[in-house]
């Protein structure tokens, strides 16, 4: 088919027609041949198609109201934070859609700057969940990094470039896709310097990390080691542009409320002073009055604060909010545990006062919504241990006494349930 001459020694590519002398390599198949040039061309076509399919469809960019409604189905409360994030994320990806500039050449192009987000508030109130839910809705790569593990370059610990590696890995090493992703840096309050005054000694895990993060937050082409770890002079690097990467920076910022109160004069002394308890929900509402100077006093450097123009906060969760978290969201804990018991053909029910007791325990422990799962595990441990081995139990009922007094939940046998069923049919 592709043989030339009687000797059959001269072959040519079945696709482009070039002879084996005109190309570097000719690969044989069953009755066909393909050259290295055609293979390279096929690879380019496949890569282009994959990159086009992996890109975010900007025509379908959700509006702020749609983003808010999606967040509302997963996150209970925190209306101000959800509204702020919805607007900030929409504006960010609208900027990416516009290519970072607006206007025509005659009037001069207007560059749209990036607006990273600072999300502060007590632990267990939904900061991480908000960021995760945003990434899920937009279908963009998402990575979570812990600021406490980061150190300045040259010291023991993780380099800031490892944050970008996590994003690249989340995008299956598709760098172009990773360049429009979201990075959530948690525990950023732990890299605050010890005082607002510059330190004489080198602060490699505090101020040094803040300085190392500056260029990445602002937008730069960073060199990332493909296997992580420290940089070596002879290894290859992945180049990633962080200009269109949205950074959401979160932290509990314990003690920041006192700095804000002292500035706005809310703190009072004397016999008639209004005292707020440690777990008073009003304590976190003061974050709504935050100013950059408060973060400066806390230990964040001015350059770092300046790269986080959007500041929003989450508030402490009260009993009503915690009960809603247990029952309302799509992935509510009560629904999750009911599903676990359904897999063993057992119904699980919680009385209303049991849910109130679980919420009260979470408030007492000061762990917020994150502590609800630990309490549920403690309450259901004995039942989850016995139920898989028993076939006579049809229903488990958890009451307030089970939560507070650690008694065993009520087990309803299958024969009782089956006897009740015909009676209900007769009455109906």
UniProtKB/Swiss-Prot annotation:
The subunit structure is: Component of the ClpX-ClpP complex. Forms a hexameric ring that, in the presence of ATP, binds to fourteen ClpP subunits assembled into a disk-like structure with a central cavity, resembling the structure of eukaryotic proteasomes.
| Naturally occurring in which organism (per UniProt) | Frankia casuarinae (strain DSM 45818 / CECT 9043 / HFP020203 / CcI3)
Q: List the disulfide bonds.
A: none
Q: What job does this protein perform?
A: ATP-dependent specificity component of the Clp protease. It directs the protease to specific substrates. Can perform chaperone functions in the absence of ClpP.
Coiled-coil segments = none
Record-listed Zn(2+) binding positions: 13, 16, 35, 38
Family matches, as InterPro entries: AAA+_ATPase, ATP-dep_Clp_protease_ClpX, ATPase_AAA_core, Clp_ATPase_C, Clp_protease_ATP-bd_su_ClpX, ClpX_bact, P-loop_NTPase, Znf_CppX_C4
An example GO BP is: cell division
Query: Which PANTHER family does the annotation name?
Result: ATP-DEPENDENT CLP PROTEASE ATP-BINDING SUBUNIT CLPX-LIKE, MITOCHONDRIAL, ATP-DEPENDENT CLP PROTEASE ATP-BINDING SUBUNIT CLPX-LIKE, MITOCHONDRIAL-RELATED
Keywords in alphabetical order, please.
ATP-binding, Chaperone, Metal-binding, Nucleotide-binding, Zinc
* A Pfam family recorded for this sequence: zf-C4_ClpX
Please identify the protein, giving its name as recorded. Answer: ATP-dependent Clp protease ATP-binding subunit ClpX
Q: Which family does it belong to?
A: Belongs to the ClpX chaperone family.
Q: Which part of the chain is the ClpX-type ZB domain?
A: 1-54
Q: Which GO terms describe its molecular function?
A: ATP binding; ATP hydrolysis activity; ATP-dependent protein folding chaperone; protein dimerization activity; unfolded protein binding; zinc ion binding
Positions with a binding annotation for ATP: 122-129
Q: Which GO terms describe its cellular component?
A: HslUV protease complex
Give the SMART domains listed for this entry.
Answer: AAA (SM00382), ClpB_D2-small (SM01086), zf-C4_ClpX (SM00994)
């Amino acid at each position: 088919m592709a043989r030339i001459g009687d000797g059959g020694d001269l072959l040519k590519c079945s696709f482009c027609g070039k002879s084996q002398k005109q190309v570097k390599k000719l690969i044989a198949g069953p009755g066909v041949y393909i050259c290295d040039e055609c293979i390279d061309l096929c690879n380019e076509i496949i890569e282009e198609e994959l990159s086009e399919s992996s890109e975010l469809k900007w025509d379908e960019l959700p509006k702020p109201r749609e983003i808010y409604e999606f967040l509302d189905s997963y996150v209970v409360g925190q209306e101000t934070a959800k509204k702020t994030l919805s607007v900030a994320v929409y504006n960010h990806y609208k900027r990416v859609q516009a290519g970072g500039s607006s206007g025509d050449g005659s009037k001069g192009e207007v560059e749209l700057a990036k607006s990273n987000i600072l999300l502060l508030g007590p632990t267990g109130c939904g900061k991480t969940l908000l960021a995760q839910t945003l990434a899920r809705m937009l279908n963009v790569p998402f990575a979570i990094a812990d600021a406490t593990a980061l150190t300045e370059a040259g010291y023991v610990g993780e380099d800031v470039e490892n944050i970008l590696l996590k994003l690249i890995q989340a995008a299956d090493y598709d760098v172009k896709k990773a360049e429009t992703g979201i990075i959530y840096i948690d525990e950023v309050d732990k890299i605050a310097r010890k005082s607002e005054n510059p330190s004489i000694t080198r602060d490699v895990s505090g101020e040094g990390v803040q300085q190392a993060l500056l260029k990445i937050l602002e937008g730069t082409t960073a060199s990332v080691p493909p296997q992580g770890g420290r940089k070596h002079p002879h290894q290859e690097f992945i180049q990633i542009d962080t200009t269109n990467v949205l950074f959401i920076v979160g932290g509990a910022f314990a003690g920041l409320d006192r700095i804000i109160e002292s500035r706005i004069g809310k703190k009072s002394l004397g016999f008639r002073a209004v005292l707020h308890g440690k777990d008073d929900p009003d304590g976190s509402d003061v974050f709504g009055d935050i100013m950059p100077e408060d973060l400066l006093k806390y230990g964040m450097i001015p350059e770092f604060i300046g790269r986080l123009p959007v500041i929003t906060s989450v508030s402490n969760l009260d009993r009503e909010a915690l009960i809603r978290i247990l029952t309302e969201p799509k992935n509510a804990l009560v629904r999750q545990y009911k599903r676990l018991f359904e897999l063993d053909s057992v119904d699980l029910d919680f009385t209303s006062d049991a849910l109130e007791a679980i919420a009260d325990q979470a408030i007492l422990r000061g762990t917020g919504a994150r502590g609800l799962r630990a309490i549920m595990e403690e309450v259901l441990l004995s039942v989850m241990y016995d139920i898989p081995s028993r076939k006579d139990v049809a229903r488990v009922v958890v009451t307030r006494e089970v939560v507070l007094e650690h008694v065993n939940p009520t087990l309803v046998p299958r024969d009782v349930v089956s006897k009740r069923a015909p009676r209900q049919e007769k009455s109906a």
